[in-house]
Design a protein with these regions (language model features):
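Sec-dependent signal peptide recognition
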Residues: 2-8
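Hydrophobic h-region of N-terminal signal peptides that target proteins for export
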Residues: 9-18
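Short glycine/proline- and aromatic-enriched beta-strand/turn motifs that initiate or cap beta-hairpins
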Residues: 19-64, 164-170
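Extracytoplasmic loops and strand-loop junctions of Gram-negative outer membrane beta-barrel proteins
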Residues: 24-28, 72-75, 109, 143
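Solvent-exposed loop/turn segments connecting transmembrane beta-strands
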Residues: 28-41, 50, 81-83, 111-122, ...
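Gram-negative (and chloroplast) outer-membrane scaffold detector with strong preference
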Residues: 45-138
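Outer-membrane beta-barrel "beta-signal"
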Residues: 87, 153-170
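Low-complexity, intrinsically disordered Gly/Pro/Thr-rich segments
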Residues: 140-148
Length: 170
């Protein structure tokens, strides 16, 4: 009886560990950059083995004027030329694993547009995720973006937080 119970526990634990691989998540995140900029990100993440993942994202940014007291209304912010949009992909190799949390490097590229410009970006940073029940995750990330072609905001340093929701594809 003890042997059968031990075999059942081992088989069940390997099935549960395998269930974490190749999972998909949809996520949303908010954050800001050092130059007064706010951003919102919507992404799809495909997790491969050992928490390594591919992320495909769409991001919108709003650049604030240097002096926020110049804004008399929020609508002026949306009418200004400080809006940027982009889509891209990132590879996230897992470098740190612990119980219910893991950390990944985030290396990616993006293409986008501003009102009068074309944008290309190279992204590098760190993303730390905390796992909750039923596949939900909370994450924070910090990183640097190198935006091309030559722009006044070539290097952007920022951070953000967000949530990842599991997607069940059967």
């Amino acid at each position: 009886m003890r042997r059968i119970l031990m075999i059942a526990v081992v088989l069940l634990s390997t099935v549960l560990v395998k269930a974490q691989d190749n999972s998909n998540r949809i996520g949303v995140g908010l954050g800001g950059f050092y130059r007064p900029t706010a951003f919102a990100t919507l992404f799809w993440e495909h997790e491969t083995h050992y928490h390594n993942a591919w992320e495909f994202f769409a991001e919108g940014r709003v650049l604030f004027p240097g002096d926020l007291s110049q804004l008399s209304q929020v609508s002026q912010l949306w009418d200004s030329s400080g809006k940027q949009w982009g889509v891209g992909a990132a590879w996230k190799p897992c470098l740190y694993r612990a119980r219910n949390r893991y950390g990944s490097a985030r290396i990616g590229v993006s293409l986008g547009a501003a009102p009068a410009d074309f944008l290309a970006g190279i992204h590098a940073g760190w993303q730390h995720s905390y796992a909750f029940r039923r596949g939900w995750q909370f994450y924070w990330q910090a990183g640097v973006d190198v935006m091309l072609p030559k722009r006044d905001d070539l290097f952007r340093v920022g951070a953000g937080v967000g949530i990842k929701m599991p997607v069940r594809i059967r």
